[in-house]
């Protein structure tokens, strides 16, 4: 697994803009492996000094976010990452969580994150909400 993360570091470190490559690889890896392997891979890759690899790991965390411990890690740890690109992926991963459990069921978590003292945690929700306003649930329930 360490070798795989090192190969991701070599591959992703040259990417300066966007996140599509990281997102595509994370989705492929998620679909190709069991959740325990992906969980270990996500935590290992999040330790990387290469922010693009941390972005990849945050996409993986998004796919695993039904797990309360993963969701708490996103809220409490990933939100402290100093790289703004990782923060953008945090917003996408929060959206993924809401999509997985359903936007209506996600409302208590949305409220919880909006009350968080960390501005990046709140930002993850509000960035996503700009996109979510087009989702059927939010169109039907604008309040």
Q: Where are the regions a protein language model picked out?
A:
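Alpha-helical scaffold domains
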Residues: 1-143
